[in-house]
Design a protein with these regions (language model features):
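Non-catalytic interaction-recognition regions
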Residues: 2-104, 111, 115, 119-580
Length: 580
């Protein structure tokens, strides 16, 4: 149950009932219909909830809003509600003050729902796919992949918490130009091992990393000179297969170490082998969106996007300024482009597997591809504008002691995900990378391993561990956490106690926001706020040494905080240690 929404609903119900009572008594005009807002004011000194009902209704009633508000307060019955008082404020606001029943029901809700606390059914019945990381399998994963991994995995969890049926997928680009380049790079290093470094020229556009040398060495170690004198295609196919068979399991292992598991690894090559790329291009042709030029087959991307922009209200002049261009789908040599395969892949997501919504997590450098891919789905009649969403994330800068870090101290090479996980705890990596996707972030390697309140993940985990220690100590003294229905919540009158329960109650709203905005960093900010609220409560309110009823009420509040901290930490893929 969302206790904040429950309180808002009750404010509306109380206000509506008071209006109907006043209208029946002839105190207010009948038949007035309004849709007022109910909000939590920034300053809760005068009330916990406020409504604009009187301001919205006064115009239709042709009365002063304060006069309407005064009548409603006199007609309002707060018996057996969450509220203890309602007051007129400002130009006609009604301010409601929460009572102990709401605070008690909030704690009871956490107890009853357990791990499901914070869940909502907004997306129930919807089938979502989140595709993320999808790193090039020709080399190690980098910091962009590290950030995208956390963002995609946590977003998927948030969507699940909002009721969606979520599928996590990694798209393996095991076909096309980059695999050809991968094979040529491995071939050069393989031959250099046998013929000598100077005897074989390395391709100028090849992959120059040491990982290519190592793969070639391993291939030579396994196969010897077996492939040296065979035809180039056979050698390239063998080298590419060997390299991918080595790299992909390593990627899976690193991502599993990072706490990420996929429902499927979808291989691009299967789209080509099954003929689905050709079939998708044919479907675009049948719909009149392709043409031939210079021996190649082109997608009329500019026309598709122009049609969409006109529907959105753009003028021909504005569209002309954009310089829209068309895209090659099939080259003159008969090979399909990466874009053609990408169109086929996304068509498969919608037309074959039936996802209601597809979310891709991409680096911001792919922003130019967003409209093109959405447009291609529109051209296929798959409503890419509304069913395909792209989350673009900005770059990551690694920093140590205020200086940008580009190379691993251990390897002397660009820092990979493996290097990062060797140095930084997984919890810190996941917490730090779960930042707002649209902001460029600095990952402070020094801060990530600090064990003090400056480290945000440590700060939150310490709050959880602190509560666990408290519970253990009190248990040793004979005090166990009571059930909510055995607690007198009217004893929790300190402002820090009530502020903490309000934070606990807001968790469901935060999950809703994170799902709506495709921004799971809402959960991080919530965790920091909840931990801060607990530390304030713990500093202000003694637990040990209090009278038993107060002790048990505060003990229950502490344990409820622990449960919600663990719930939210689990949601973002971090642990909640019981001692630190």
């Amino acid at each position: 149950m969302n206790m904040i929404q429950s309180a808002k609903d009750q404010v509306l119900a109380l206000t509506t009932a008071a209006y109907q009572k006043a209208a029946a008594a002839g105190l207010l005009p009948e038949g007035v219909t309004v849709t007022p807002s109910v909000e939590i004011p920034k300053d809760t000194a005068n009330g916990d909830y406020t409504t604009t009902f009187c301001l919205a209704a006064a115009k239709a009633m042709r009365m002063n809003p304060r006069q309407v508000a005064q009548i409603l307060t006199e007609q309002m019955d707060l018996t057996d509600t969450y509220f203890t008082s309602v007051e007129l404020a400002g130009p006609g606001f009604l301010n409601f003050r929460l009572g102990s029943r709401w605070f008690g029901d909030t704690v009871a809700c956490v107890e009853a729902e357990g791990a499901d606390y914070g869940r909502n059914d907004t997306l129930t019945g919807k089938k979502y796919m989140v595709e993320f990381v999808s790193a090039n399998p020709t080399g190690p994963m980098h910091m962009g992949n590290a950030r995208g991994g956390v963002l995609g995995d946590t977003l998927a969890s948030v969507l699940q918490k909002s009721g969606a049926d979520v599928w996590r997928e990694f798209y393996v680009n095991d076909a096309g130009n980059q695999i050809d380049k991968f094979a040529r790079s491995l071939d050069a290093r393989y031959q250099q091992l046998i013929r000598g470094e100077d005897a074989v020229e390395f391709p100028e556009d090849g992959y120059h990393g040491d990982d290519i040398r190592e793969l070639a060495r391993l291939f030579y170690q396994q196969e010897g000179e077996k492939y040296l004198d065979c035809d180039e295609k056979t050698r390239h196919d063998a080298l590419a297969k060997f390299g991918l068979d080595h790299n992909i399991p390593k990627m899976k292992a690193d991502l599993a170490r990072y706490g990420i598991q996929y429902d499927a690894w979808f291989f691009e090559s299967t789209l080509h082998e099954s003929g689905y790329v050709a079939d998708s291009v044919k479907a675009l042709t049948q719909r009149g969106y392709t043409y031939e030029k210079d021996g190649a087959l082109w997608l009329a991307t500019s026309r598709i996007l122009a049609e969409n922009l006109k529907k959105a209200g753009k003028s021909d002049e504005d569209i002309e300024k954009l310089g829209l261009k068309d895209d090659v789908l099939r080259r003159a040599n008969g090979f399909y482009t990466y874009f053609a395969a990408d169109i086929a892949y996304h068509r498969n997501k919608f037309a074959v597997r039936g996802f209601d919504k597809v979310i891709n997590v991409w680096g911001a450098d792919h922003h130019g591809h967003v409209a093109r891919l959405k447009g291609a789905m529109d051209a296929l009649g798959l409503d890419g504008e509304h069913r395909l969403d792209i989350v673009l994330m900005q770059l990551v800068k690694l920093v140590r002691d205020g200086e940008m870090v580009r190379m691993s101290k251990r390897t002397g090479k660009a820092i990979s995900l493996t290097d990062l996980l060797d140095e930084i705890p997984v919890d810190a990596c996941r917490y730090f990378f779960n930042a707002k996707p649209e902001t460029q972030m600095e990952f402070d390697l020094g801060l990530a391993v600090r064990e003090d309140s400056e480290n945000p993940v440590y700060y939150v985990q310490y709050a959880h561990a602190r509560i666990c220690t408290l519970l253990k100590n009190l248990e040793a003294e004979g005090y166990t956490v009571p059930a909510a229905d055995a607690v007198d919540f009217s004893l929790l009158t300190d402002e820090t106690e009530q502020a903490l329960i309000k934070q606990i109650a807001s968790y469901g709203q935060v999950v809703l926001l994170a799902a709506r905005d495709y921004d799971p960093s809402h959960i991080n900010r919530y965790l920091t706020a909840l931990a801060a609220a607990f530390h304030k409560f713990y500093a202000a309110c003694r637990i040990k040494g209090e009278e038993k009823p107060v002790l048990l009420a505060r003990l229950k509040l502490a344990d409820t905080t622990r449960a919600v901290l663990k719930n939210a930490m689990t949601l973002i893929g971090c642990s909640a240690p019981e001692k630190m």
